[in-house]
């Protein structure tokens, strides 16, 4: 069984009960390649160039449950109107939300004990190491960079595709579908990488 208890309650448990308990604080950590963090203890501190100042109308969002995910929890999340995109360890999901569904979703952590974290999926999380370095160092905005871009395939995806196409210097691999995503490989200017990362999908 999985229980959340305070430090005080843990210290006051009988020694026999304490010996049988395994503290599983790793389940609170979302294992993003770019920025693993504990949703209950860590402060997410991201550079301004790769951080949203405010969420777009519709955007990718990151949520985390209190433990191993149950089907009824996913159902409750879907009933807010969001779309489940894919699972992320530990006990987290990437979702697609609009303002209406996001407002409903924001109520869940307070009214349901199964959700403990909900926030926009920041541009920093989407970007590979070499892209982050170029955006943050801003050494040569005119550098031509080869990138593979993956965006969530929603009903307004062509808007983001058009922005990317307008920034493309050379198309290497045309747009194509893989699971829930549209993918392409192109060359762009390093100075345009932040603009692409800031796209909502």
Model-derived segments and spans:
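Autoinhibitory N-terminal propeptides
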Residues: 1-201
């Amino acid at each position: 069984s999985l229980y959340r208890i305070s430090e005080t309650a843990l210290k006051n448990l009988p020694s026999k009960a304490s010996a049988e308990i395994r503290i599983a604080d790793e389940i609170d950590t979302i294992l993003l390649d770019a920025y693993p963090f504990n949703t209950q203890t860590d402060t997410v501190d991201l550079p301004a160039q790769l951080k949203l100042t405010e969420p777009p109308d519709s955007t990718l969002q990151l949520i985390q449950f209190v433990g191993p995910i149950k089907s009824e929890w996913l159902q409750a999340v879907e009933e807010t109107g969001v779309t489940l995109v894919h699972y992320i360890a530990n006990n987290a999901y990437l979702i697609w939300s609009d303002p209406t569904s996001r407002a409903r979703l924001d109520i869940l952590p307070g009214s349901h004990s199964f959700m403990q974290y909900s926030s926009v999926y920041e541009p920093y999380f989407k970007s590979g190491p070499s892209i982050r370095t170029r955006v943050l160092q801003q050494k040569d905005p005119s550098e031509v960079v080869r990138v593979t871009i993956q965006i969530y395939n929603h009903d307004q995806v062509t808007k983001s595709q058009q922005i990317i196409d307008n920034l493309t210097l050379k198309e290497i691999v045309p747009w194509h579908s893989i699971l829930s995503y549209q993918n392409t490989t192109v060359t762009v200017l390093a100075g345009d990488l932040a603009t692409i990362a800031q796209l909502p999908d």
